[in-house]
């Protein structure tokens, strides 16, 4: 890491952490193990991040910018509320399938013994996802799908479905793809 630029070093640390999170056994990751993976000292890690919590915050920032960036694209591209909700569901499940290590962050698995603010941040992430679903479902109501009175409950149901699929994926050691057999399930969830 000696010949890389500081911004690249931070990225290398986060990539190594994400890679370590992809291990199916889900063991606790220590800064010593992360430093060994990168062939640097723990002090070298702490030159870029004040704590392991800051490293996890870096991963959460990546998750937030990726997910909400795509949600914004979906709402701009799709005119139909049901289509928006369906696309968001598929994107959220696909994000986990493409980023198994990040799935452990999404479900809070690796945040259990870390700084409490990290779990609060993930809870806020879930709230924003639910808000995005509410927006899509409200649009769908104006287009003749469903009832306004059901929007909040349906949005909550969709978030619970997604987080359940993420949990199952992570707890299966990343063997049960979150996108597996979802077509019929999503049709049932989104039926008016």
Give residue spans per PLM region.
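Short hydrophobic/aromatic patch on the recognition helix
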Residues: 39-49
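Hydrophobic/aromatic residues within well-ordered alpha-helical segments
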Residues: 9, 52, 59, 63-67, ...
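Amphipathic alpha-helical packing segments from all-alpha helical-bundle domains
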Residues: 65-68, 72, 116-142, 152-156
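Hydrophobic alpha-helical connector segments
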Residues: 58, 72-98, 151-158
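Amphipathic alpha-helical segments used for helix-helix packing
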Residues: 96-117
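Hydrophobic/aromatic-rich alpha-helical bundle segments in the mid-to-C-terminal region
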Residues: 103, 107, 119, 123, ...
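Basic, helix-initiating cap at the start of DNA-binding domains
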Residues: 1-37, 54, 66
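Amphipathic alpha-helical segments enriched in hydrophobic/aromatic and basic residues
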Residues: 21-24, 30-31, 42, 52, ...
């Amino acid at each position: 890491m000696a010949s890389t630029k500081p911004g690249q070093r931070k990225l290398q640390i986060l990539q190594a952490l994400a890679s370590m999170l992809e291990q199916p056994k889900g063991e606790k990751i220590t800064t010593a193990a992360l430093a060994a993976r990168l062939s640097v000292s723990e002090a070298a890690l702490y030159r870029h991040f004040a704590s392991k919590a800051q490293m996890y915050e870096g991963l959460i920032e990546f998750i937030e910018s990726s997910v909400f960036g795509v949600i914004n694209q979906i709402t701009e591209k799709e005119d139909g509320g049901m289509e928006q909700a369906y696309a968001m569901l598929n994107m959220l499940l696909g994000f986990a399938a493409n980023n198994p290590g990040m799935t452990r962050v999404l479900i809070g698995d690796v945040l259990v013994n870390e700084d409490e603010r990290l779990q609060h941040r993930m809870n806020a992430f879930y709230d924003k996802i639910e808000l995005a679903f509410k927006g899509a479902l409200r649009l769908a109501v104006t287009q003749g799908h469903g009832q306004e009175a059901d929007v909040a409950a349906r949005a909550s149901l969709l978030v619970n479905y997604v987080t359940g699929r993420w949990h199952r994926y992570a707890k299966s050691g990343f063997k049960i793809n979150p996108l597996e057999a979802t077509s019929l399930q999503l049709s049932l969830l989104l039926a008016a």
